[in-house]
Every structure is written in structure tokens, then in C-alpha cells.
Amino acid sequence: PLLGDIACGKPIVAQDNGDSYVSAADTEADFCLIAKGDSMVGARIYDGDEVFIQQTDMVNNGEIAAVVLDDEATLKRLYYYPTEQKLVLSPENPAYEPLVFTGEELNHVHILGRAVAVQGRLR
């Protein structure tokens, strides 16, 4: 199902609009989100692209993840440093700063899943 939008820039309010469906061949996706913004252009994820997400709360370092921060959703490359108790959500555009969470802030971060495919227009 197409659940709604996900920020590729400043996080946006997470809303479930799961009344549409999008088809993608040979993906292990559980749902799809529409990219909004340009923070992930270095990973070839552009504004308006359909991003297919495999639902999981475990994402490997360096994978692109859909993440909810309180009630706002964003798509970023995820890095976790357990010895420092630090999570970094890194954009793929130098115009944006990474989002860094430590200590108590980590309780406000929820991983929805990992990006497994992207579908968009030829550029």
C-alpha cells in the first residue's frame, strides 16, 4: 500500500493514507511512501519518487531508513554508534545537516523500516 509522504529534507508530519496501492516487481517491500524534498538526491531519491519500505525495526549501519521522530517522518541514511549511545540520520545532500540523537533523545526515534527500492521518472 501507498501510505503517504516521507520527508527528504526537514521531517514532516507522519500520516497514514493507506487507501492507494503501487505495484513494484521483485521487491520485499511492505509499503510505499512518496519522497518529498531533495535531501536524498545523492542516493538518487528525488522529490516525487516512490520509495518502497521493508518494515523492520532493525536497520544496518549505512542503510537508508524511514524513521519517525515523535510524529514526524523522514528518510535518511542511518548510523548507530552503540558505545556512544548516538544515532545519526544522514542526508545525501551537502545542503542539509545530519540529525544527531543521543541519550534520552533516542526514545523519540522509531524506525519504520529500510528502503529496498525506488521508482521514479528518468532524469
Question: What kind of feature is each model-predicted range?
Answer:
Residues P1-D47, N61, A73, Y80-K86, ...:
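Short, positionally conserved secondary-structure boundary motifs
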Residues L33, A65-V67, L89:
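Well-ordered beta-strand positions enriched in small/hydrophobic/aromatic, beta-favoring residues
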Residues E50, L75-R77, V100:
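Well-ordered beta-strand positions in beta-sheet-rich domains
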Residues F52-I53, A66:
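Hydrophobic beta-strand signal
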Residues I53-N60:
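Short acidic low-complexity segments
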Residues R77-L78, P91:
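Residue-level recognition of conserved beta-strand positions in structured domain cores
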Residues L89-L106:
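Short solvent-exposed strand/turn elements
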